[in-house]
């Protein structure tokens, strides 16, 4: 879910002189998924390697570590806790906690409201959470039927509930991501969430930096 840029990340790192393998963590099925992506671009990649004559191809060596339903990963002084969230019918949907020097970032991933967000997001310095913005998508006769709108909303977190979730986690900051739709009434969205959370959320955007 939302990993279409993975191959571009790998090959761009090679273009940027990466000379060591990648380690990729993911749920069951990650090995097969990455293998299929690498195979899909094998001919194009081989041509680049042969013609560009770079000194290393280590960036194309991928170490896959598949994990279970919950657990921890440590990378130097960064501890990452992963836990299942509810994005059914999508299987193997995960949220993450990133802990560093007593600071905590909780990332919801794609999910409808679920207990694990409340459990693992407790007292987060930043809760980065997806949102489906109620009332912004209108029904059409073709690509956006009533059923479509219902089903899309049903496996995401509606804006009408997100403020309550943030309040229950007691997070210090709430940052919104995965904004559906991308065009919306920002003032109205902030008010909807603020009414329950007690604070204004931060509307996320690409390359946004937040001090934790």
Locate predicted features.
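Binuclear metal-dependent hydrolase catalytic cores
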Residues: 1-106, 114-117, 187-211
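Cap/insert and terminal regions of metallo-dependent hydrolase folds
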Residues: 95, 102-104, 113-208
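Active-site glycine-centered loops adjacent to acidic/histidine catalytic or metal-binding residues
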Residues: 110
């Amino acid at each position: 879910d939302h990993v279409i840029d993975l191959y571009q990340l790998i090959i761009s790192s090679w273009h940027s002189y990466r000379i060591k393998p990648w380690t990729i963590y993911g749920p069951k099925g990650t090995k097969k998924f990455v293998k299929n992506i690498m195979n899909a671009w094998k001919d194009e990649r081989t041509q680049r390697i042969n013609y560009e004559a770079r000194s290393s191809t280590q960036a194309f060596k991928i170490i896959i570590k598949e994990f279970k339903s919950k657990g921890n990963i440590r990378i130097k002084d960064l501890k990452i806790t992963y836990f299942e969230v509810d994005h059914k019918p999508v299987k193997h949907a995960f949220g993450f906690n990133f802990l560093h020097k007593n600071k905590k970032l909780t990332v919801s991933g794609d999910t409808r409201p679920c207990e694990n967000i409340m459990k693992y997001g407790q007292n987060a310095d930043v809760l980065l959470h997806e949102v489906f913005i109620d009332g912004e998508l209108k029904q059409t006769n073709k690509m956006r039927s009533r059923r479509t709108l219902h089903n899309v909303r049903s496996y995401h977190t509606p804006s009408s509930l997100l403020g309550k979730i943030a309040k229950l986690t007691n997070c210090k900051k709430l940052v919104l991501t995965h904004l559906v739709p991308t065009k919306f009434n920002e003032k109205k969205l902030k008010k909807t969430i603020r009414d329950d959370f007690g604070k204004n959320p931060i509307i996320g955007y690409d390359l946004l930096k937040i001090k934790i």
